[in-house]
Amino acid sequence: MRGYFIVLEGIDGSGKTTQAKLLAEWFEDKGYEVLLTKEPTDSELGKLIRRIILEESVIDGSKISYEAEALLFAADRAEHVKKIILPALSEGKVVICDRYFYSSLAYQWARGLDLNWLIQVNSFAPRPDLAILLDLPVKESLRRIKLRGTLTEFDKIVELQRKVRHNYLKLAEMFPEMRIVNALSSIEDIHSDIVALVKHELLGL
């Protein structure tokens, strides 16, 4: 029996990682085998992408182009899909992924890349059974990022986050598997909303 593939998406600070863990625990309590994963992955390629994002100068001393960045994300995703996601699904596991190709579309579209090109680059990636968009106002996102102590270049981040949030909401209109959850609620209420979605959309409960 094929498993379920669930993705959590949202702008920085929206609580994706926390909610992915809580959802994994919920499924495990119900007796399901669960694979909790993320993108970029922990592979060598995924680590390289994180270095590029953080340092922006690891290739030749200058920032790589957004096109090259998009292709690196897609390469990491291709490995992730073939070696981790599809095998787990074929074993009947529930795969919960913290970020997926929607992140590439939302962020790299915000940086000026062509959306249709980005969709084509990621066309190999199977669509999940359910993609949950944790929607959060940019002001609250920035407050949470500040609390983590990871906020730099404030003005640039504000503008990027605005564009990314707008893009995510557009993607929710384009992709029927995507559902929106209000990420301003408490952790517990958000989890309850996600569980309700899973029960309705996937489990028929």
UniProtKB/Swiss-Prot annotation:
It comes from the Archaea. Its EC number is 2.7.4.9. Keywords: ATP-binding, Kinase, Nucleotide biosynthesis, Nucleotide-binding, Transferase. GO terms for molecular function: ATP binding; dTMP kinase activity. It catalyses: dTMP + ATP = dTDP + ADP. GO terms for biological process: dTDP biosynthetic process; dTTP biosynthetic process; dUDP biosynthetic process. ATP binds at residues 10-17. One of its GO terms (cellular component) is cytoplasm. Transmembrane segments: none annotated. Belongs to the thymidylate kinase family. This is Probable thymidylate kinase. It comes from Pyrococcus horikoshii (strain ATCC 700860 / DSM 12428 / JCM 9974 / NBRC 100139 / OT-3). The gene is tmk.
